[in-house]
């Protein structure tokens, strides 16, 4: 989802003095992550994106669907394979991220019998950017601040019950007819009950090229993060996307991705959209 959301946000940086848009997306991801069996998750996000001069801000709240409470989404946009959070069950002792689960080497066996709703509202996430360089002829560099508020019930499996806050840099530039976007944010992640999650650096780099005399743009991306738990490899994935810009200023982006490490989704696909609401 981060690919779709990020590229649509970048596309919203127009010459308009002020704009407001509805942004949303849907993503399906599947993989075994650090578990001994495969699982999946679907993520639906709805939010608003606002820009005025050098400032851009966005906020959204997700609806999450998954068959068991094995995965949780951090504010960094990364999947945290907790093994299921109950808010009262202690960890296994062998893996600090395996709350209430058994471990086999570096893999966790998901626990049985944890109360869990298949559909739930996740924690809302907000982001704000301040552009340092205003000259479009040169690379655009922005300071980024972000936060995830712990509003979802941790016992439902859809929230960590802790604040996540992040700060970093993002950039954009044109090279040989292509647009290059880069983003790196350090996240201080709150530990869910019974788990130990490391703070993380989350990064992404995307390259997009518009097809000649066409509203279509092809995009490639690589994204990842530092390790979230001791003994667990860092997630890394690659993806491709195709975006379509409508005359009304609306845009759509379809993506597919593949995990390059076990802790990333083995396969993911998503759809993102942006609909302008007001422009001055």
Go through each PLM region and give its residues.
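Bacterial N-terminal signal peptides
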Residues: 1-11
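Transmembrane beta-barrel domains of Gram-negative outer membranes and organellar outer membranes
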Residues: 16-176, 180-191, 198-239, 248-255, ...
